[in-house]
């Protein structure tokens, strides 16, 4: 890392970007890649942010004073929330290079485990932030693509009635190609978004020349005077101003893919200047041409370039949507690995990049929800009301979680933390409260989605915890099992691997195999997969073998929450001295237990949660598919458990 880079941009020395081959790539290449993935959401906000402030349901009067006031609010919101809070502060709180709500939750939970009350509060906040992310993942593709296609109203007014149908077609194609991966088209994301941000800057500069006086709005004086002068109307305007910072959390979430330094450099050198120039260009346009408020972004360009701009904007919003969809896949895998969701089918779409995954269930569910939003809300203006609630809610939670990191992990001075986080919360809560006014107009949607997913995430986590405790309590101790083994029990050649979720006792599948088949394999392995609260586990720590008796092993396979467990691959890669025996794939049989959960009648909420847990368990992907076990070597034994 070059010595001329300012220290506040560098991050900690251990911060590296990791791809599928685990090798760091050059900073310039990572910057270009980050421009194509990380900044899609915030980079397409100019399509609708200014328009909503002056023409939305809570619009403010459009005079020069108010335009300067709104521009000042936009500039300082981006400066405080994105440039300072996320880029400088929150991006320092990585979990071994990974960012995002669940990675931050895993980091903080470990530090707070000695304080039960704090641990529960932190867990609830982190889980709700992850739940809100899914609401954002549904809204972003809908509002982004819709706002781009709405440019046809300027470029080709006679096609206005085709805005919604075209949006649906574009989104359907986007979701349909997910199963094929984005390896090929993904290489175009960076160059396309580079052209997009340069276009934003050029359009802004072109219009600034007509009213350069708008640059005075860089002074916070205009933001403060606007708030005091307009009062309630200015407060409501915050609900639209916050649209300029939607996507800020992506800088933190995608940190593991590109590294801290490339994201920071891309932000300060390209994305931030382009956004500010474009917003101020829109402000200048509205001063000298108030009629442009119908769609200020597309009116920045000459009429002859309106259609090419619509095409470029559509490409940019598709890329932004792709980044959000890929993020939903990644967060879902994290949630599964950390025990917040049942197993789902995870398909790797690239042999080189292990981060490129496809989850069919998540993909088609997202598509259906996005289509419902487009058809139901019809315009980006209507969707804007739903957008801000999820974003501002996540911003508040991120501030609280990073404050916990400052106190428990970084050991910062409590007074310093109080003032810093307090300042962030004043800004975040102001935006959140302004957006809460929009709840009846569509803001209810991300809250409903977040509430449903919070219930699912917590129900599964709590249910698995209680189920494993029950299995552990009922399990026969290994010592008793070994002592009860008679020499008369036939031993058959080969190795039997019994998967078990607990690290103690004998798996139910082993007892059932003994009961029904009356045999024991010459070598028995009790295998438990453990997911640690880190993104990746080094290969040298992957496998741990404990010899419980001659030819009777307990094996632990450790993975991080960003990895997909592959049991046969892990066993094949293990050394013979590490594993304790020679691994021969064709001599191994895998035994898995499939529990059928039977909820008992319980009054109130507990009964409903038990029923939900049992339903989720039935929907879970089989252990055979999830752990990549060869189907012709698997024996599945069922059991019924009352909960």
From Swiss-Prot:
Gene: kup2
Any Gene Ontology CC annotation: plasma membrane
Pfam families (UniProt xref): K_trans, K_trans_C
Origin superkingdom: Bacteria
Protein topology in the membrane: Multi-pass membrane protein
Identification of the protein by name: Probable potassium transport system protein Kup 2
Summary of the function given for this chain in its UniProt record: Transport of potassium into the cell. Likely operates as a K(+):H(+) symporter.
GO molecular function, one term: potassium ion transmembrane transporter activity
Region called Disordered, residue ranges: 1-20
Native source organism of the sequence: Paramagnetospirillum magneticum (strain ATCC 700264 / AMB-1) (Magnetospirillum magneticum)
Catalyzed chemical reaction(s): K(+)(in) + H(+)(in) = K(+)(out) + H(+)(out)
Record's keyword terms, sorted: Cell inner membrane, Cell membrane, Ion transport, Membrane, Potassium, Potassium transport, Symport, Transmembrane, Transmembrane helix, Transport
Parts of the chain that traverse the membrane: 27-47, 70-90, 120-140, 157-177, 185-205, 231-251, 267-287, 300-320, 357-377, 389-409, 419-439, 440-460
């Amino acid at each position: 890392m070059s010595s001329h880079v300012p220290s506040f941009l560098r991050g900690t020395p251990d911060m590296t970007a990791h791809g599928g081959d685990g090798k760091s790539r050059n900073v310039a290449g990572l910057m270009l890649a980050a421009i194509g993935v990380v900044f899609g959401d915030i980079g397409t906000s100019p399509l609708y942010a200014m328009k909503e402030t002056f023409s939305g349901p809570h619009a403010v009067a459009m005079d020069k004073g108010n335009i300067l006031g709104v521009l000042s609010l936009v500039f300082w919101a981006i400066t405080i929330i994105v440039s300072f809070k996320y880029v400088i502060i929150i991006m320092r709180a990585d979990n071994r290079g990974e960012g995002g709500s669940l990675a931050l939750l895993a980091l903080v939970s470990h530090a707070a485990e000695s304080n039960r009350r704090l641990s529960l509060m932190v867990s609830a906040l982190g889980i709700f932030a992850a739940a809100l992310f899914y609401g954002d993942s549904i809204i972003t593709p809908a509002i982004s693509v819709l706002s781009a296609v709405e440019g046809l109203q300027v470029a080709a007014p006679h096609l206005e009635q085709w805005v919604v149908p075209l949006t649906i077609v574009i989104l359907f194609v986007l979701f349909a190609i997910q199963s094929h991966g984005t390896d090929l088209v993904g290489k175009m994301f960076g160059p396309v978004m580079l052209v997009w941000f340069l276009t934003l800057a050029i359009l802004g500069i072109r219009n600034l020349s007509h009213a350069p006086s708008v640059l005075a709005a860089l002074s916070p004086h205009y933001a403060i005077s606007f708030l005091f002068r307009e009062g309630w109307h200015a407060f409501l305007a915050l609900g639209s101003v916050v649209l300029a910072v939607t996507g800020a959390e992506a800088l933190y979430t995608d940190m593991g893919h590109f590294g801290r330094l490339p994201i920071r450099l891309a932000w300060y050198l390209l994305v931030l200047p382009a956004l500010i120039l474009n917003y101020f260009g829109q402000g200048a346009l509205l001063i000298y041409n108030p009629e442009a408020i119908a769609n200020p972004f597309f009116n920045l360009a000459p009429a002859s370039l309106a259609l090419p701009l619509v095409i470029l904007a559509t490409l940019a919003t598709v890329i932004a949507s792709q980044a959000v969809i890929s993020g939903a896949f990644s967060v879902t895998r994290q949630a599964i690995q950390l025990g917040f969701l049942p197993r789902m089918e995870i398909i790797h779409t690239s042999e080189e990049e292990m981060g490129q995954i496809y989850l069919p269930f998540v993909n088609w569910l997202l598509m259906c929800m996005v289509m419902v939003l487009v058809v139901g809300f019809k315009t980006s203006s209507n969707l804007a009301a739903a957008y801000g609630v999820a974003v501002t809610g996540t911003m508040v939670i991120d501030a609280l979680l990073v404050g916990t990191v400052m106190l428990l992990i970084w050991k910062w001075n409590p007074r310093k933390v109080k003032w810093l986080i307090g300042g962030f919360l004043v800004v975040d809560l102001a935006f959140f409260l302004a957006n809460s006014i929009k709840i009846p107009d569509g803001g209810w949607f991300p809250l409903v989605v977040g509430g449903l997913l919070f219930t699912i995430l917590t129900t599964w986590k709590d249910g698995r915890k209680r189920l494993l405790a029950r299995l552990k309590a009922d399990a026969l101790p290994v010592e008793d099992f070994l002592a009860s083994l008679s020499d008369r029990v036939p031993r058959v050649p080969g190795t039997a691997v019994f998967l078990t979720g607990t690290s103690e006792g004998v798996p139910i599948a082993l007892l059932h195999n003994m009961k029904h088949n009356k045999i024991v394999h010459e070598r028995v392995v009790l295998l438990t997969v453990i997911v640690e609260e880190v993104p990746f586990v080094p290969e040298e720590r992957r496998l741990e073998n404990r010899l419980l008796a001659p030819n009777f092993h307990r094996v632990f396979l450790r993975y991080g929450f960003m990895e997909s467990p592959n049991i046969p691959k892990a066993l094949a890669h293990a050394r013979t001295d590490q594993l304790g025996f020679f691994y021969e794939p064709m001599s191994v049989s895998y035994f898995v237990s499939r529990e059928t959960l039977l909820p008992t009648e319980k009054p109130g909420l507990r009964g409903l949660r038990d029923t939900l847990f049992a339903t989720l368990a039935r929907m879970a992907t089989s252990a055979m598919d999830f752990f990549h076990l060869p189907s012709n070597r698997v024996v599945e034994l069922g059991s019924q458990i009352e909960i």
